Amino acid sequence: MMLAQEYKQELVSNTETYNISQKLDGARYNIHLSKGKVEIMGRHSKKPNNYKYPEIESEAIQLISDEDITLDGEMAISTTYGTWELTNFNALASREHTENKKQIQLLSRMLPAKFIVFDIITNDTIKLPLKERMEIMQNYFGQYPNLRRIQPIYNLNGDMDFANKLFQQAYGLGLEGIMIKKLDSLYEDRRSDAWLKWKCYKEADEKIIGYTSKERQISALILESGSKVNAIIDDYWKDIILKQDISTTKENTGEVQRYFSKPSLTAVIKYLERTDNNIMRFPILKEIREKEA
């Protein structure tokens, strides 16, 4: 799986041509199509997740051919706003953590996911530059409501003025950011500065060391930096958090703080910046995962 480097101005060359597209706030997935079979694989998945996204599987089946194909993209729940996708990560998280078959079928109708494809990998396209891979993608999508290709926004030749305007627009809409990709880049199974991610928010992984109770049973998560992030936790993670062994309990102005004896969970947090004492400003919980993942 090809991964992007963090954007830095010096990584953009005025001798290269780039494509700009939206950085989607979803979950990275690959869909493998081969020999009459579809496999929907998350970035950290050990087995296919077809059962979680029946609306995606039913459309992907129609793309099966004699050729082995991998579609690289982002699973998201979103509404289209002009050239942008307004994503709802919390809604996607509820889909990701639902295991009940009846609930999955219900959510696939009430909260249908979109698989937004930004690359196509075959034995032939692996040798082609991004520009040609993007042209090939145009032949695969268009008639499917939930399976579609990423909307290219702009091509630029090292001139960052328009890229800055797009970034500000993405920031104003509360989006994740933008992607800047070299049009002549080959698909590499590694992190590469041929793809750059320019995020509106910074992002960090921090251990969850406890939680607070005030208005809700879990009002906020306490992070290892001392930051607190308010969040409505879904039932899957709420159950795991409430089963953690507690070493210390404190109470302050009506807020109960409980600290874990052995923190085992990690929070992925979006935030604007940190204070001098390392506390995050305007933190937003993006996801929770097992510490070792």
Language-model-detected regions and their locations in the chain:
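Covalent nucleotidyltransferase
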Residues: 15-143, 272-293
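Nucleic-acid 5′ end/cap handling module spanning
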Residues: 1-43, 123, 142-270, 274-279, ...
